[in-house]
Amino acid sequence: MPQATRWPDIVFASDWRLATLSEATKAGRLRRIARGIYTPSEDPVEAVVRRNWMQLLGRAFPGAVIVDRSTRAGSPDSSGCLYVDHARRRALALPGLVIVPRSGPGPLSGDQALHGFYVSSTARGLLDNLAGGGGRCLSREEIEAWITEIATRHGEPRLNALRDQAREIAAAAGREDAFTRLSTIISAALSTGTVDAVVSHALQASAAGNPYDHERLALFTTAAAYLADQAPASLPDLPDLASRRRLFPFYEAYFSNSIEGTEFTLDEAASIIFDAAIPAERPEDAHDVLGTYRVVADPVEMARAPGSADDLIELLKRRHAIIMEGRPDKSPGRFKTRANRAGATVFVAPRLVEGTLRAGFDVGRSLLDPFARAVFVMFLVAEVHPFADGNGRVARVMMNAELAAAHEGRIVIPTVYRGEYLSATKAATHNAVFAPIAAVLAFAQRYAAQVNFETRATAERDLARTNALVDPQTAEDNNIHLLLPASLDRVGMA
């Protein structure tokens, strides 16, 4: 008995005997897609064509170069359209795929060879699109967005290399005029061009000397929109709570450092803050706690919320200088000069820090609710990560200053609540989901309002009975959660 033929996902008639194809088609083992093209798959024809577009392109347009607007993705767009440079004049229309050719110089230096075809280099793609050509080319706004993305992700060296490569191929591509336009746009992206040479807000900001991370700004815009849609969450810091809050700054500083891994016992932290007893074996960690306390214990300082982007920059630098005074190697009060990251999260590039803070502040200034502003500024600072170290601490200081300035209750994140806080922050960073961080901070604010901070004894009684000091991993392993003091009081009265 003859062995059954094992057909590839896409079958070209030129590779097989006509009789074999005819028999398989009649028997229902193959379906005809178009002239000379078959498939054994029972999937929708459009799906078969889309997943085999590379083979189809290489066969129908051998040596073609993907060009024009198709260069950006290097593949067909959502409608299935793919633009190529090839000598063939007629388009190929298949279910789910339309390949549209135009004449051109063919492959150039820098183009990437794939399965019988080429993909234009980024430099060539930009030149082709800037040359124009109706619907087959990107708009000026789309081109500038592409360049902005390159600048954000790869920085100045990549832009300069891109311009050099474009200069080398411009004549061969017949794109000398397009190169002039590209060079002007890149100059704006490098803050060496003029504002009126570009149309996008991101590149205009770059040209004006305030380049920003446009992807982060989109994230901040989403955050502000979410927070603006929430009902106001007022929790006033009433005057009759003043005595209960005498020691609040101590615990605020303690827990803010604990989140960052600076671990002391409460007695050790009290000696550092109230007795200036700096442990010889951990002077830098001790100064972190002391510096944070100096900021949050100053009622005048904590009553200041930024009213402008200039205020934001000034407050950030001054507060950071105080918090990180004990770590001169971390450049207290000065923005970072090297890129930083945490795990898979890469923060805003140094050259984009100030511009991103300014643009982000402008996005958030429309928020009216103090709690919403507090959440927003905390996320803004944490996401930009403007300093070499101390970013989380200064972000939470900025958060609580927004609340203090509006006479609202401030927030502490107890040790046991660290996991929830960090998970919620990651959800905002990676998924643009802001409900968790708003909920976590709202609960932490309610918690802080219910703890009796009048004396260390009263405060630490509440901290102990609410699980505040439990190690986060121990809490997770044993299903231990942060409890509200009021909920325990109600149980005790029952």
Where are these regions (language model features)?
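FIC/Doc superfamily catalytic core
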Residues: M1-I33, S41-W53, G58-R59, G63-D389, ...
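Short helix-loop capping/hinge segments that flank enzyme active sites or metal/cofactor-binding pockets
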Residues: Y38
